Amino acid sequence: MTTLFISDLHLTPSRTDITECFVQFMRNEAVNAEALYVLGDLFEFWIGDEDCTPFAERIRNEFKALTTSGVPVYFIQGNRDFLLGQRFCRETGITLLDDVCTIDLYGEKVVILHGDTLCIDDLKYQEFRKTVHQRWLQWIFKRIPWFIKKRIVAKVQSGVRDDKQHKSLEIMDVNQQEVAQVMSQFCVKLMIHGHTHRPNIHHFEHDNLPLTRIVLGDWYSQGSVLKVTADGYSLEQRPFFTE
């Protein structure tokens, strides 16, 4: 059997190529998997579980069809879909996991997370993350009218784009010491995460122990899937479908 991992799809109505690749993946690959893990940023931005647009319903239906077929789906919130909550999970049958958690992957303990919490050198982002994850603020936001939410999100997205233009790639990448600290904290030799859009498999040592960090790819120009079996793992690409 195969366990699949994806992240950073940034699904949005304007990118039909990404959506179609995702749908084909769900129907042709994920349906045959032992489990599917989505490690955040499934959406370009998820405003709230009350989203009932045709696009949101289409994505819900794909997950519902997959879980109904018997394939468990596990989700970790990313920095763009941290408002995805229990209502979405109930409607689709997926399971929401903690921001950082460990799983048993064919006999090996593995730590999985979105990855933004590893980018501790980006102080401005970490402060922003701390703010938007406050429960009282999310409680208020969930009760704001939909049209106002959209305006707020549009303004935030504009600010994020402007901010990124003035940051170095190093600041937006993970901090290696933080990676080692988290792996040591959870007593694991393998970490899987997304967020940085830098797909790769990193092998390194810490305290004389061989460690591995797998970085999932984004879906901006092609699909990216991590396939794990009892025999090993492979980070693979999936081409977009063209007319």
Curated annotation (Swiss-Prot):
UniProt pathway annotation: Glycolipid biosynthesis; lipid IV(A) biosynthesis; lipid IV(A) from (3R)-3-hydroxytetradecanoyl-[acyl-carrier-protein] and UDP-N-acetyl-alpha-D-glucosamine: step 4/6
Residues reported in the UniProt entry to bind Mn(2+) 1: D8, H10, D41, H197
Stored InterPro entries: Calcineurin-like_PHP_ApaH, LpxH-like, Metallo-depent_PP-like, UDP-diacylglucosamine_Hdrlase
Reactions mediated catalytically: UDP-2-N,3-O-bis[(3R)-3-hydroxytetradecanoyl]-alpha-D-glucosamine + H2O = 2-N,3-O-bis[(3R)-3-hydroxytetradecanoyl]-alpha-D-glucosaminyl 1-phosphate + UMP + 2 H(+)
One Pfam entry name: Metallophos
Gene Ontology biological process terms in this record: lipid A biosynthetic process
EC number: 3.6.1.54
Topology with respect to the bilayer: Peripheral membrane protein
Cofactor(s) the record lists: Mn(2+)
Gene Ontology molecular functions: manganese ion binding; UDP-2,3-diacylglucosamine hydrolase activity
CC cofactor note: Binds 2 Mn(2+) ions per subunit in a binuclear metal center.
Domain of life according to the entry: Bacteria
Binding annotation for Mn(2+) 2: D41, N79, H114, H195
Class in the EC hierarchy, top level: hydrolase
Keywords assigned by UniProt, alphabetized: Cell inner membrane, Cell membrane, Hydrolase, Lipid A biosynthesis, Lipid biosynthesis, Lipid metabolism, Manganese, Membrane, Metal-binding
Family: Belongs to the LpxH family.
Functional note: Hydrolyzes the pyrophosphate bond of UDP-2,3-diacylglucosamine to yield 2,3-diacylglucosamine 1-phosphate (lipid X) and UMP by catalyzing the attack of water at the alpha-P atom. Involved in the biosynthesis of lipid A, a phosphorylated glycolipid that anchors the lipopolysaccharide to the outer membrane of the cell.
HAMAP family found in the cross-reference section: LpxH (MF_00575)
Protein name according to UniProt: UDP-2,3-diacylglucosamine hydrolase
Organism: Vibrio vulnificus (strain CMCP6)
Gene that specifies this protein: lpxH
